[in-house]
From Swiss-Prot:
Ranges: Sequence repeats: 2-8, 26-32
InterPro entries hit by this protein: Tal-AA
Further remark: This protein is produced by a polycistronic gene which also produces tal-1A, tal-2A and tal-3A from non-overlapping reading frames. tal-1A and tal-2A produce the same protein from different reading frames.
Subcellular location, record wording: Cytoplasm; Nucleus
GO cellular component, one term: nucleus
The name this protein goes by in its record: Peptide tarsal-less AA
Amino acid sequence: MLDPTGTYRRPRDTQDSRQKRRQDCLDPTGQY
């Protein structure tokens, strides 16, 4: 495939990526 790691399309990684990014941005320590 073109993106084996799922860089272009990530159906299931979208939620994970969003939550991880938000946690990193809002609470890096993971308080929230």
